[in-house]
Amino acid sequence: LGVSLPGLTQWEKLRMSYVKPDQLIDAIVHSGVDKSNLTVPQMVARGTLAGAILGAATTVALTAAEQTGLPIVGAVLFPVGFVMIILLGLELVTGSFALIPLAVMEGRTNVAKCVTNFSVVIASHIVGAALYGALYVTAITYAGTETSDPMVQAIVHLAEHKVLPYEAVGLGGIVAVVIKAMLCNWMVAIGTIISYSSSSTAGKILAMWLPVTTFFSLGLEHAVVNMFVIPAGMMLGADISFGQWWGWNQAPVLVGNLLGALLFTALPLYFSHRTRINRAVDVPPSVVRREPALLDF
């Protein structure tokens, strides 16, 4: 660590930044412990900023899709927000859904701290996303005096699409939204965990980009994205009430995101790579050993 290797090419350096899966588990468990031990003010600050950043990334994606007529362009651009959140060390509850429970499983934190983190960060996301939404709505409507911007109707349509079709079919709608949320956070949790698979910034960015682009391109349900889209749509006149928002989208999406992170990502990876021998010790991710020749390029 810290040794200069001037003779290596950039490709060789990228190979050396790869972290083995068993060491990856050490890193994410340690991260889960760190997240559970944050103070409430830290959680509030990090969660609020993350909510606002993800709202901004969503508007970038919607703007790109609107301008090009190609939703896939928006999906490719959306991960900029996720990358900023991870690299800045902020709190994104959909990622924490995969990390903190593993720390609880290993007895390195407790359920009370886990629930506190989830609750405080979710509330902070709502504040950050809604604040950004209010500022963005004010900007594109010229303080409520103009509604000709194409983004107005794009956001209203998306907000209504995230609530009304589920409500229209009743119980089947709840099942559908939970499944969409589970599939979404399968990818988001992979994005969170895979960011620990490289010790280089470039490697982290590339690794995160792939699964996050996948979820957004499929039109799945992400709780924090919806904390921006639906309130912003309501501010712009979407035919949605607070009860409809929470009953037919936000609450079931949070449940689905938690289940997806745990059942589809965290637990399968944990039980695939964790053994008694490599069970986590209190080693921070920054000192996880690197292996130079682990990939066949």
Listing of model-derived features with the role each one plays in the protein:
Residues L1-R15:
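Short, Lys/Arg-enriched N-terminal segments with co-localized hydrophobic residues
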Residues L14-F297:
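Alpha-helical transmembrane segments and their helix-helix packing motifs
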